[in-house]
Amino acid sequence: MSPGTFALTWYGHACFGLHAGAHSLLIDPYRPGGFGGAMALPPIGDPFDAVVVTHEHDDHAALDALVHPAPRVEAGPTGPFTLTRTRVYHDEYRGRRRGGTTDILSIAFANRRLVHLGDVGHSPRPDDLKALNAGPRIDLLIVPVGGYFTIGAAQAWEWCRALSPRAVVPTHAADPRVGLKLRPISHFLATSPWPVEEVEMSVECDEALLSFKSRVIVMGTSAH
């Protein structure tokens, strides 16, 4: 893998694996069979150097369900990755309806920057944008789009326009393997001003993918 190239794997729901060179980081692991069987997703069998979570809900922070346990990291440097957090709310009522706060994760490495919006439930606020736009341009933005528990399509596009990433990966949307009340990714794609590229569960993010006009990358197309 050449410098500046990284691989992203989607495991389901809001869980992603990041590989940069020989180093790896898992984001927001779910619990297989969680929520009374609603999370009908397979165990995460790949090993990782470390795990980071956006918030403590069981569909995002089930470290004890990993096949290969890995240490949890919070912020600062871990291997080649530097993690920073921006605290936001799970809904538009300061977290009173959907369970408090969630963090936005910014992960910088090898002249790249990935941002995972967690379960953000409101439009971007000036302080959010000030914090997130303080660093280099975002290469890849992972944004929830399914609504109900998080923002939906319209507010997701507010975040995308405000942060202007090179590429967007929509997540936390309807999935036949997840029995939660979520809207399909198609609602988000219907108003996309950017070209859409469909891939399967993994994608190699290189200069060719990230250098041109902003685009939407839909991962795991067979699952939607």
Regions picked out by a protein language model, each given a short descriptive name:
Residues 93-163, 176, 180:
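Active-site-proximal loop/helix segments of hydrolase catalytic cores
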Residues 1-21, 78-86, 210-211, 217-224:
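Zn-dependent metallo-beta-lactamase
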Residues 29-31, 56, 88-89, 118-122, ...:
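Active-site metal-binding loops of divalent metal-dependent hydrolases
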Residues 3, 62-103, 107-111, 193-213:
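Metallo-beta-lactamase
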Residues 7, 23-24, 111-113:
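Residues that mark the start of a beta-strand
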Residues 15-52, 60-72, 87-100, 120-134:
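Pre-active-site segment of Zn-dependent metallo-hydrolases
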Residues 49, 139, 166:
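Conserved acidic residues
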Residues 9, 99, 163, 167-224:
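Binuclear metal-ion centers of metallo-dependent hydrolases, dominated by the metallo-beta-lactamase
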